[in-house]
Amino acid sequence: MSFVISRRKFVLSAPVAAIGLATSRRVSADPLGVPPGIQLYTVGADMQKDPAGTLRQLRQIGYLYVEAAGFGKLSPADFRKAIDDAGLKCPSAHLQFSSADPGPLFDQAHALGVQYAVSSVLIARPLGKGMQGFVHSLSSLTADDFKRNAALANDIARKAKAAGLQYAYHNHNFEFRDLGGGKTGYDIILAETDPELVKFEADCGWMCVAGKDPVDFFRRYPDRYRMIHVKDFVKGPATTDLMGPNRPKGTELGRGFIDYRPIFAAAGPAGVQYYFSEQEPPFTDMSALAAAKADYDYMHAIG
C-alpha cells in the first residue's frame, strides 16, 4: 500500500475493461477465517469514475471488506452510504496524518464508521516539494527522524484513543534501510511506540521487497499487528527504493515471488484481524477490476 501524500489520490490508471464477475459465493475457507478485503487504492481510477458501481462490482467478486484511501469526489458520509449500499464493510481508512491537529481526520473516520485510523506514510519533519522532493525526504530519513516519527505516532494514537479510534502505522520499504549497525527505521518505530496505543498494518509486499520476512515480525512482536496488506511483486533484487529506477514492479497475487501461506499461518496467532489485497500500478496485463478478482481468487484459494 502506499502513500497518502500523492499515491493516495486515486490516480487514474488504465480504463476499465469489460469483465465478467461471478456472483456466486465460494464455500471454501478464507485465510484467518475472515472474508478477503481490498485496499481501494487498487481500483482508484474506477472509484473516481463510478464509486457506487465499483463497490458493487467488488462485492460481486466476493469481497466483504474494503479499506478506504481517500474519498474521491464524495464526502465521508456519502462514501459510507455507497459502501453500505454495496453490502460492504469498511473497518479501516488511510488518512493524511501529519503534525497538524488530527481532530478533523478523526471526524472523517467517524463519519465513515471505521475502527482503525491508519497513516500510510508518517513523517514528522517538513517534506521536500513535489514528487522528487518527497522521495528524497523518505530516502534521507535519519535515526533521529524516525524517533520523531515514533513520537508523532504516539501522540496521534493517544488522541485517537480519546476519540474512540485505534491508530495503526502502515509501512513501505523505505523504513527498512540500514541506518547503521543493522538498525532500521522500522526497528525504531516498533521500539519507541507504545504497544498499548500504536498498532501496525504490515504491508507484507513492501516488507518482502526490502528483503524482510513478515513472519519474523509477527513472531517477535505479537499483538502489535492488526491488519496486513497482501500484495505481490515481480521478483528482483531486494531494495528500499520506493519510487526510483529500482522500484519493484507490482503484479497480481500468485504471479510474483511472495508465498502468502506461511504469512497467513503466522498472522492469525499474532493478532491480525483483517487482510486487504492491494496491487501497485500500472496494470499492464489486465484491468484493475480484473486484477482485483485474480487477487480475491488467490486469497480465497489458499485459505
Region locations from a protein language model:
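N-terminal secretory signal peptides and thylakoid transit peptides that target proteins
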Residues: M1-A18, A22
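Acidic/histidine-rich catalytic cores of soluble enzymes
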Residues: A162-F257, F264
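Acidic (Asp/Glu)-rich catalytic clusters
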Residues: D30-P31, L55-Q60, L74-C90, G103-V114, ...
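C-terminal segment of N-terminal export signals and the immediately downstream linker at the start
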Residues: S24-Q48, Q57
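Hydrophobic faces of well-ordered beta-strands that scaffold small-molecule active sites
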Residues: V34-Q39, V66-A68, C90-A93, A117-S119, ...
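Active-site acidic/histidine proton-transfer and metal-coordination neighborhood
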Residues: P15, Y65, L95-F200, L289
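Conserved, mostly hydrophobic/aromatic
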Residues: I38, L58, V66, I83, ...
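Acidic-and-aromatic substrate-binding clefts and catalytic sites of carbohydrate-active enzymes
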Residues: G44-Q48, E67-D78, H94-G103, L127, ...
